[in-house]
């Protein structure tokens, strides 16, 4: 019976859900976040733009997470707009700084794709 329930949960669980993305952002898992990238995704950290394949974008996030002693991720606001675009405003905080985070995602069929992932230090 346990096997049937587990199979049922795994079958209906969407591995590309908005909740999973938020969890990945909270735990700073670049590898999990990369599941939401495609060839058009871009990351902007303090005005420096990074584009490329998933590996390059993942490396950019890894570097940011490694260089900054982040403690907390907090969502400020999220919503949707026209054409299946979802946006999220959030903050990462460290011992010394607060980073503003802005994400735009495209909901394409049953998958979310990060279009833009922007991080700026709050002054």
What are these regions (language model features)?
Residues 1-21:
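Bacterial Sec-dependent N-terminal signal peptides
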Residues 14-29, 36:
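Short, aromatic-enriched amphipathic alpha-helices that serve as compact interaction elements
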Residues 20, 32, 56-60:
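Alpha-helical elements of Rossmann-like donor-binding domains used by nucleotide-donor carbohydrate transfer enzymes
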Residues 31, 50, 74-82, 120-123:
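Exposed acidic/polar residues on beta-strands and adjacent loops within beta-sheet cores, strongest
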Residues 37, 47-49, 77-79, 91-94, ...:
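A mature extracytoplasmic/lumenal domain signature
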Residues 37-74:
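Short solvent-exposed beta->alpha transition segments
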Residues 59-97:
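Surface-exposed, charged secondary-structure patches
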Residues 98-123:
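Short beta-strand edge/turn micro-motifs at domain boundaries
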């Amino acid at each position: 019976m346990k096997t049937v329930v587990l199979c049922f949960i795994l079958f209906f669980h969407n591995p590309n859900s908005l909740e999973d993305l938020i969890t990945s952002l909270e735990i700073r898992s670049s590898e999990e976040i990369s599941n939401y990238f495609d060839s058009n995704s871009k990351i902007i950290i303090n005005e420096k733009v990074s584009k490329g394949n998933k590996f390059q974008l993942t490396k950019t996030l890894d570097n940011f997470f490694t260089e900054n002693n982040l403690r907390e991720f907090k969502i400020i606001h999220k919503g949707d707009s026209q054409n299946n675009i979802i946006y999220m405003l959030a903050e990462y905080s460290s011992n010394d700084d607060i980073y503003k985070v802005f994400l735009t995602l495209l909901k394409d069929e049953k998958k979310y794709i990060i279009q833009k992932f922007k991080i700026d230090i709050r002054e």
